[in-house]
Each structure stands twice: as structure tokens, then as C-alpha cells.
Amino acid sequence: MASSNGGIVGVDNPPVAQPAVITTFNSSGTLTTAPYTTTAQYVIVAGGGAGGANGNGSGGGGAGGYRASVPGEASGGGASAESLASVSGATGYPIVVGAGGAGTTSDGARGSVSSFNSVVSTGGGGGSFVGPEKPGGSGGGASYSTSGGSGTSGQGFNGGASKYNGGSNNGGGGGGGASEVGTSCPTPALPQRGYPGGDGVASSITGSSVTRAGGGGSCGRFENAVIGAGGAGGGAAGANPVSSTANAGTANTGGGGGGEDGANGTGTGGAGGSGVVIIKEPDAGYRVSGVWDMNALYDNVKAGTWV
């Protein structure tokens, strides 16, 4: 029997439109989806790794892992966009935004993870002071003739290798970025020279193109060393040894921190930049009057409210 809602059979069901919704999280929180959302695009960037220090050519910090599901764009490590996240409408989802790794007087600390709906981006690897490479979302740059840290598949690239020839001919490797490997010190090493971090990945999920997850630059040895540039996307440049603290990665980009030479033994590597999580709920279209899903039909018939 037709009800009084314009001749439509069933419970009152007014038309509704749900436009696209974009939410940016610069710190951890909760995403509450719009009522008719069923899928979501995302860009999830972890915290960047800190640069190394006092290593006679310390490595730059690796960028935080970069994962994205924006159609037509890239994820990190040369991967294509991931599948859209499946979500439910009017539901809360925890968002974790990773902190950047802290700068120290030796190996840079690794960045922290960022996550949404079981999608986790790995923190960037710290830049090396001495010894083994530091893996991460993107790997940290090396120091003292070691290979750069390895990046995580689908998130970022390796850090650059270093070379130690004694004297001033030492150079750390640049931190890996989301779109390219950190630059390695050549053999033989050039005098007093640092090397750039790898570039990050650009996304237009917010409507404007922004590059994130660049690796930190390394440094050479001694006061006149040429510093390595930070990778595009928040990576910090390496520091000259006369600076007591190296440059930090840009906040909310997951950029790696810069390496600090520390010929005086007291320097501190640059901190990694914090991460970011961006969620886009696509336009859900126009829900017309007189259309119900099967759950609504069942619930109303069971309750005796279907007319």
C-alpha cells in the first residue's frame, strides 16, 4: 500500500547527496567515515629516520615508508597505486601518524610507523654512524664503507653507500627516498663531499600536488665539506661540521634527517620529519528517494515498520 511519502511504498527515505570528503591527519586520531562511504583512497607516510652523526661522513636518514591508493598515482619503491581500502559508513577507524626518528650523537634513530585500516607504512631507517646499514621504509644512508640500508618493497628505496679512504676523502650515503635510491659516495671518494637523499613521491589527493618522503642528505668530513642536498619531499640537507645539530626533515612529510660529520665529536644528527595520513572518501553520488538496500528492507519488515 502506498504511504504518504509521495506515493512511494516503504519507510520514509528522503534523497541525499554525499560529496567527496578529504581528511588530513598530522597527528594520530580517529577517522569517522561519512554514512554512505564504502571505499577510501589513502596516502600513508611514516616518520622519517634521523641522520647519523660523528661518523667521518655520516649517512642521511631514510624517508618514511610511503603507501598510496590514489588511482593513476604511484606508491613508494616504484610500485603502482594499491587497491582502495574497504570501509563501512559512519564508522570510526584509528589513525596512527608516526613520529620522526630522534637525532643522536651516533646512529640516527628509526622513524615510527603510520597506519590506517590495517595498512601500515614502515618508519624510515636511520643514517649510519659506523657499521651496519639501517633498513626502513626507505633505507638510511651508510657511513664507513658500508652499503646503504634497504628500503621496504612497495614503500621506498635503499639508502646510498659510503666510502672511507682515510683523511678527508670520506663521504656518507644519502638517505633513500620513496621514488629513488639515495646517492652513493663514488670510488674513489671525492674529498670533503656529502651526497643527496633520494626524492619522494608526488600526490594530488588533496587537490594540489605535494611531494613527500624525501631522503636526508649526507655530509663529508671537515669544515669545508660540501653537504648533500635533501631529497624533494621534506628530506633535510646534511650539515657542515661547524653546526652542532644537523637539519631536521620537514614535519608531516616523512622526510629523512640530515647527516652530521662531527669532526669535533659532539654533533647531533638531524631528526626525521613526522609522517602524515590523508584519507579521501570518494563522492558517493545521489541516493534517490524510494531506493533501499536489502539490510534496510529486512530490518523494517522484521520490525513491522515497512508500509
Predicted regions and their residues:
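Intrinsically disordered, compositionally biased repeat/linker segments
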Residues: 1, 294-307
